[in-house]
Regions:
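Structural signature of tandem alpha-helical TPR/SEL1-like repeats
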Residues: 25-34, 59-71, 93-105
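Alpha-helical segment of the N-proximal tetratricopeptide repeat
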Residues: 8-41
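Terminal, low-structured helical/coil segments at or just beyond the last alpha-helical repeat
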Residues: 1-12, 88-116
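Short, charge-rich amphipathic alpha-helical segments embedded
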Residues: 37-58
Length: 116
C-alpha cells in the first residue's frame, strides 16, 4: 500500500515537471491540463498548485488562479513563497488590501524563519 502511494507521488511529480516544461515553452493551456492531472494524482502536491495558479493567472483566469493560490497557502501555511504567490495574484486582480495582507504574512514568515 505504501509503495503504491510512493508511486503515485512520483507520477504526480513527473506530471508536474512535464507541465512546467510546457509552461516555459509558452504552452499554457497544455501546462494547466498537466498541473490539474498532477493534482488529481496527488492533491497535496503543493508545487502543482503553485504552477496551476501561475498558469491560470497568465491566462487571465483570475478567480481560478486565486483559488489555486489559496489552496497552496492552505497546504504550505508556513512557506513565505506561498503567501507571496497569493499576494502577486491578488495584486494582478486589483485586490490591493488582500494582496497587502498576504504580503505582510509572507514578510512575517520570512522574518520568523531568519530568526531561527
Amino acid at each position: 500500500m505504501q509503495e503504491s502511494g510512493a508511486q503515485e507521488k512520483s507520477l504526480a511529480k513527473t506530471t508536474y515537471k512535464e507541465g512546467f516544461g510546457l509552461f516555459v515553452k509558452g504552452q499554457i493551456e497544455e501546462s494547466i491540463a498537466l498541473y490539474q492531472k498532477a493534482i488529481e494524482i496527488d492533491a497535496k502536491l503543493a508545487i502543482a498548485w503553485n504552477g496551476l495558479s501561475v498558469a491560470l493567472a497568465k491566462q487571465g483566469k483570475m478567480k481560478d488562479a486565486i483559488a489555486a493560490a489559496e489552496k497552496l497557502v492552505e497546504l504550505e501555511p508556513e512557506d513565505p513563497l506561498s503567501h507571496t504567490n497569493l499576494s502577486r495574484i491578488l495584486m494582478q486582480n486589483g485586490l490591493i488590501p488582500e494582496a497587502e495582507d498576504a504580503r505582510a504574512r509572507a514578510m512575517g514568515l520570512q522574518m520568523k524563519q531568519s530568526e531561527t
